[in-house]
A protein has these predicted regions:
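Extracytoplasmic small-molecule ligand-binding "clamshell" domains
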Residues: 1-71, 75, 117, 137-138, ...
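Extended ligand-binding regions for polar small-molecule ligands
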Residues: 28-38, 94-104, 110-113, 121, ...
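Short helices/loops that flank or line small-molecule/ion binding pockets
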Residues: 37, 46, 50-62, 78, ...
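Periplasmic-binding protein-like
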Residues: 9-11, 85-89, 168-207, 225-226
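Acidic, polar ligand-binding/catalytic clefts
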Residues: 32, 43-110, 120-121, 164, ...
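Bilobed "Venus flytrap"/periplasmic-binding protein-like clamshell domains
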Residues: 13, 23-33, 93-132, 136-137, ...
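Sec/Tat-exported extracytoplasmic proteins
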Residues: 38-39, 59-60, 65-68, 83, ...
Length: 226
């Protein structure tokens, strides 16, 4: 009988982060609630993404979360049902009139506008292939939002939930999203091959907390919507 699951993830508030010596966050809490309902406790540790993948490779972790599914990863791991869908949007200063058309080449729509992006992060080919003339890299989402307010760039590409969380926490005003461009990614928990029973129990628990309302309660706890 499975009683404990060792999971890893990289720190990414408000989805998983450490506060007052405890790991909390939307994704962490959803996973914890899904497994708790099955009588399984979760032991989560946070590391850089590369360290997380290394721990999975050494089988020192049972699963990794907030991961996208690729053919290569699907060969290595057993993927859960969808944990949630993440969305990244272009943010701008309030009053700056700009909107996008998803059917038109992104670079041509940007013109002379600079875009703030996370260093080392892969978005979509349309964004990743933008030249240095368009992009300014920052090390954190907080730096992206502050850079936007300080006019380092006209647009910042930030996860919707992260932006909402940081703007409330840091009391940042004068920022809103630009319509017409959204990057959506489905996120999962990936379990070690051989732990299909754990994945199955998680999936059942996830369905149950979505049905009984706990899933939505977790999002609201952090000021977010599903």
């Amino acid at each position: 009988m499975i009683s404990k699951a060792r999971l890893v993830a990289d720190p990414y508030p408000p989805y998983q982060f450490e506060e007052n010596g405890r790991i909390i966050g939307v994704d962490h809490d959803v996973i914890t609630e899904s497994l708790k309902i099955q009588g399984i406790t979760v032991e989560t540790s946070l590391h850089s993404w590369d360290e997380c993948m290394a721990l999975m490779g050494k089988r020192k972790a049972d699963g990794i979360f907030q991961i996208t599914r690729t053919p290569e990863r699907a060969r290595r791991f057993y993927f859960s049902e969808r944990l949630r869908t993440a969305s990244a949007l272009f943010y701008k200063k309030t009053g700056f009139a700009v909107k996008f058309n998803s059917t038109v080449d992104l670079a041509s729509q940007l013109g002379n506008l600079k875009v703030g992006v996370l260093s080392g992060y892969s978005y979509t080919p349309a964004v990743d292939n933008l030249g240095n003339a368009y992009k300014i890299e920052k090390e954190s989402s907080e730096s992206l939002l502050n850079g936007l307010l300080q006019d380092e760039f006209a647009l910042a590409l930030v996860d919707r939930g992260v932006a909402s969380y940081l703007m409330a926490k840091l009391r940042l005003e004068g920022i809103d999203s630009a319509p017409g461009h959204e990057i959506s990614r489905e996120l999962y928990v990936a379990f070690q091959k051989g732990l299909s029973e754990l994945a199955h129990l998680f999936n059942i628990g996830l369905r149950r907390i979505k049905k009984n309302g706990v899933y939505g309660e977790v999002f609201r706890r952090y000021g977010l919507s599903e």
